[in-house]
């Protein structure tokens, strides 16, 4: 509408946006949902699947999982069914070990989710991962450093906290720092909290 100022348009867009922002990683869209359950209306974006590898695995075990990933790729009712992401967890503090596993995962051609709490390991992993990545590792304790790493690399940032209240506070701080490209982990420490 030509009569609205840019500020008014921005405010209107923010107020009418879906409660869950759409995040794009590679060719895939996450979020953008306006309902919690499919029977309420419909889910906007399909569920995406990942295979998990970890620095705690032997190299042979990780290589086998990544090789088997390529076997799950078929078409059903006109829709391609395959594993879209590789989830790469870091359980060590050695950036070189993590970067090597990330390099193997990136070679599959799938988008990556990098679970990493250490800033130096995250930097090493992002150097070999490419752009289609979710850096999953911001917490109330390290969100400033992880936000800087994610913004520099131009990737989505995953945010964790022990409680919903802490998660809310951390997200508010990240948004105030200019990052709205976030994926939130609302999983609690126990099933009851989730």
Feature map (PLM): residue ranges:
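Well-ordered, non-membrane alpha-helical segments in soluble/globular domains
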Residues: 59-73, 95-101, 166-169, 193-194
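Acidic (Asp/Glu)-rich catalytic clusters
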Residues: 41-44, 66-81, 102-107, 126-130, ...
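Short amphipathic beta-strand starts and helix->beta connectors
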Residues: 33-37, 97, 170
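N-terminal active-site wall of soluble small-molecule enzyme domains
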Residues: 90-130, 142-146
């Amino acid at each position: 509408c030509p009569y609205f100022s840019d500020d008014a348009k921005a405010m209107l867009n923010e107020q009418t946006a879906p409660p869950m922002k759409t995040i794009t990683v590679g060719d895939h869209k996450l979020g953008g949902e306006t309902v919690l359950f499919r029977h309420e209306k419909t889910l906007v974006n399909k569920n995406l699947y990942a295979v998990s590898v970890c620095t705690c695995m032997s190299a042979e075990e990780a290589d086998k999982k990544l090789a088997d990933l390529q076997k799950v790729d078929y078409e059903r009712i006109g829709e391609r069914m395959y594993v879209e992401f590789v989830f790469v967890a870091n359980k060590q503090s050695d950036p070189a070990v993590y970067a090597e596993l990330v390099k193997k995962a990136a070679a599959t051609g799938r988008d990556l989710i990098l679970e990493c709490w250490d800033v130096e390991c995250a930097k090493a992993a992002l150097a070999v991962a490419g752009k289609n990545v979710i850096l999953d590792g911001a917490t109330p304790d390290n969100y400033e450093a992880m936000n800087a790493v994610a913004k520099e690399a131009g990737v989505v940032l995953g945010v964790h906290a022990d409680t919903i209240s802490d998660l809310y506070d951390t997200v508010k701080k990240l948004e105030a720092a200019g990052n709205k490209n976030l994926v939130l982990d609302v999983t609690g420490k126990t099933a009851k909290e989730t």
